[in-house]
Amino acid sequence: MTRTLPPCLLAFVAGSLLALPASQSLASGYHFGSQSVSAQGTAHANGAEAADPSTIFYNPAGLARLPGTQVTGGMSILLPRGDYEDGGSTDVFGNPVEGDAGSYLPDAAAAPNFYFSRQLNDNVTVGLGIFVPFGAKLDYKEDWSGRYGIQSASLETVNFNPSIAYRFNEHHSIGFGVSAQYIRSIQRGAADVKGASRQLAGQFVDENYDQTRLAATVPGLVELIYGVPVPEQITDCQGVADRDGFVDCVASNFADNVEGDGYFRAKGDDWGFGWNIGYLWEPTENTRFGISYRSNIRHTLEGKTKWSFADVGGRVPSPDVDLGDGLLPDRDAIHQIFDPDNWINPGDFAAARLHPNSNGKTAIDTPEMLSISAFHQLNRKVALMADVTWTRHSRLDEVRIGIDQVDGYPYFNGVTEGDLAVQQDWKDTYKISLGMNYQYSDDLLLRTGVAYDKSPVSSTQLRHPAFPDADRYWLSFGANYKLTPDTSVDLAYSFVQFDSGKMEYTDNCSPAGWVPGSGGLYEDSGVRCTGNGGTYKGEYKTHIHFFGLALNHSF
């Protein structure tokens, strides 16, 4: 029988890893929850078992225990359910934002993995792993209450991990691997054009307060002078005495003409490189302990940011009108503001003066992991195992998409696009797994395991709809069945229950593209940003049914 792997098989596996993104990460943060079906059956407690080539991910030193040439290829299939109940989300002005999220996770998702090992001699074994280390897939309804934060997101990765292990003697082995990791991210969200229109109108009225107040106070005289009636959006605010209230009244009235949202889509990809190392100590034939470390990988994703305002309706006065400094403005300028025939579609203005399609980039540091594991063959039938994994999620303090400026684009009032930033301040986490094997017969091995996986989200105020993570609990079952002396199949099932995740995240930006100043939403502080402002408030309830199937063969 040939020992050569067909190139088409490797190409298929690599392509599948990108074509089938995972749902919301099954491990804490955005780690995908399983890189091996045999490991899934024990809730990933088997880091020191080294039962097949998937030990490349968990502890590469385990390769030294694998005789001959071995191949394992698996598929993880997820059936998630994620429900969101809104608890009073508001836009930047404090108005309720309504809309059903539906199930924010896809109906199903899948991710394959592939591992190969080859024993070169009594001391050296080499291998290759291709797997999904990170993944996320969120898919809210377009009109849900948190749409100004995000509507959909996809994070896809594939990791190529060639490894080598050296066995010093029957007690000590080490392993080392390098990783080439490809990552691709796509996210989509809504743009609050109505909010932006209200801000720009309010800024205009505030800067031209005397003229606007005069028009509201003596509309008949203004019409007599300029030959055009004062819009009711201004005259309806005649009775509002204080300046701030008057400005807000006029701005709100004009913004009520606006219907529909704009949309943005950000896409980027990158290659990054890292390494992993492991040590395996076998004090007796039936007992072994392992320690392994997987490095962080730094990615700088570069891609495109695109905007669409085709769904925006309504007409408002253009904010790009200069009334001059006098109490009696220019006649043409007044007609631009007062005559509805001269009003513009706010979506067209947003595309032409606020949001060009542009390049962008974001930096992502995947977290390093440190694992300590143990395995003990209690008797001929029963084996016990445990694993504790620490993950440095604190590397993620924020997600920031830097948006490049477009040369020659006529940014309104010089308000260029700022970064789109999501504050996270994640904390380091740990996962504790306990598992057991039971040799039911010569051909059938049964597995089970439980795990507690801590979430990196540090508070309700820092839980964002793009990262609705929470603590989770694993209950897993698995089996390995020998079809022939050289071929076996692995099966696994896990039920993953998430704690309820309450959210009350506030976006400090505003739809007009600036951080509001001390004077309120109509004052430009000079600090640029991309966002919509508002508060996303609600609660997530999530569980996942997780199935695994793998085929193993020894040559």
Where are these regions (language model features)?
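Short N-terminal alpha-helical targeting/association segments
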Residues: G15-S16, A51, G360
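Outer-membrane beta-barrel porins/channels
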Residues: L26-Q40, A108-F555
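N-terminal, post-signal peptide beta-strand-biased segments of exported outer-membrane/organellar beta-barrel
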Residues: P21-V126, I130-V132, I164, S494
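Low-complexity, polar-biased intrinsically disordered regions enriched in Pro/Ser/Thr/Gly
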Residues: R3, T90-E98, T530-G534
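Positively charged n-region of N-terminal signal peptides that target proteins for export
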Residues: M1-P7
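Bacterial N-terminal signal peptides
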Residues: C8-P21
